[in-house]
């Protein structure tokens, strides 16, 4: 018999996080998240999303008292208000191949939602759009990334057999093969937008990003460019500060490109591309996502010492809608691609993108895109 218990103590929260490492221990494609990042994200006193979110975490135990599953129940009041919905989200959903485990975990989230007046359950989703989204349904033989969750093939089987659940949205992840030079199409469009629209590349330093407020401008632009994407809610000032502190110090400025409109007095920021040398292999060398004793070295080596990176993760790309048709995206790539080539990039990896987001999927054409992973989010009426 499976028993579901609420996470109430720091020890139980550690067990909640550690379950994932144990479940996929030895899997060559599983990329462990950083332990402390996971704990901070789930900690109600540390994650700024709790200014407008509420959550409860559950663990599943078998008869021997062994943990066999976990799930988070999240209510994002800000997103519900923005999209005029009453949804409870489920996330951090991992379990052994036992239908009783997965069913009872989701029932716990459903009960939590009903108790709080929710009308639907949806997931896997996190607190915000920058958390991990979607359940992996294809690409189990592909290396994961630090920004996405892994999963077993039986996860999808459980969800598709679960009573009342249907697919809400589908995502894709794409592998972009690195060219030997910038594709002619990008070069042609990039030159045109500079001459015709007076749009130009700006390369910020880490000082600019952290101290001069350019990093904040990037996330404010993210809010504007992502505002109509499925389930998105704007990041508040406190969240932006957290993301700047969490990500910007570790990003190579060469992999950050900003597009500015020189027709405006302030040279308005209208687009950005933020990427990073893949940390997948470095994270796999940590002990359960811990930086100590030697996990930190593998990450530092990848980010700051090595001059080669065969895989680049495209973390975030955003262009204001009125500038997409002008070719601003192509201008981004004319700057970023030479940087990737100089680091020996073999391919770049996109993060999750909605299958019906034509603006996101159409821009990769000249880079021989290969869709190598797919994900799904599910919804059920309570």
Predicted regions and their residues:
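Extreme N-terminal starter segment of soluble prokaryotic enzymes
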Residues: 2-3
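Acyltransferase donor/substrate-recognition loop-hinge adjacent to the catalytic core
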Residues: 149-229
């Amino acid at each position: 018999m499976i028993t579901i218990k609420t996470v109430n103590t720091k020890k139980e929260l550690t067990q909640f996080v550690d379950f994932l490492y144990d479940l996929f221990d030895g899997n060559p494609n599983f990329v462990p998240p950083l332990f402390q990042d996971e704990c901070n994200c789930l900690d109600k006193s540390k994650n700024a999303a709790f200014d407008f979110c509420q959550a409860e975490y559950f663990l599943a135990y078998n008869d021997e008292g062994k943990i066999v599953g976990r799930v988070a129940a999240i209510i994002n009041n800000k997103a519900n208000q923005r999209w005029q919905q009453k949804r409870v989200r489920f996330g951090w959903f991992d379990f052994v191949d036992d239908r009783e485990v997965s069913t009872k975990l989701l029932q716990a989230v459903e009960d939590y939602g009903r108790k709080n007046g929710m009308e639907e359950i949806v997931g896997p989703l996190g607190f915000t759009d920058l958390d991990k989204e979607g359940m992996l349904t294809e690409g189990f033989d592909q290396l994961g990334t630090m920004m996405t969750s892994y999963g077993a093939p039986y996860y999808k089987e459980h969800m598709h057999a679960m009573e009342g659940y249907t697919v809400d949205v589908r995502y894709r992840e794409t592998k972009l093969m690195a060219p030997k030079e910038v594709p002619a199409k990008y070069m042609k469009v990039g030159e045109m937008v500079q001459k015709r629209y007076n749009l130009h590349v700006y390369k910020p330093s880490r000082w600019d990003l952290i101290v001069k407020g350019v990093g904040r401008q990037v996330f404010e632009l993210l809010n504007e460019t992502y505002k109509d994407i499925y389930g998105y809610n704007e990041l508040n000032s406190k969240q932006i500060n957290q993301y700047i502190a969490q990500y910007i110090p570790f990003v190579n400025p060469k992999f950050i490109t900003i597009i500015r409109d020189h027709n405006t007095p302030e040279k308005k920021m209208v687009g950005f591309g933020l990427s990073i040398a893949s940390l997948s292999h470095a994270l796999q060398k940590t002990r359960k996502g811990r930086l100590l004793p030697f996990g930190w070295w593998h990450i530092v080596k990848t980010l700051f010492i090595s001059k080669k990176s065969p895989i680049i993760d495209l973390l975030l790309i955003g262009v204001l809608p009125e500038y997409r048709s002008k070719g601003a995206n192509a201008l981004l790539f004319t700057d970023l691609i030479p940087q990737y080539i100089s680091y020996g990039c073999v391919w770049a990896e996109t993060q999750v993108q909605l299958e019906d987001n034509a603006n996101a999927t159409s821009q990769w054409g000249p880079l021989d895109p290969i869709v190598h992973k797919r994900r799904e989010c599910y919804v059920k009426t309570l």
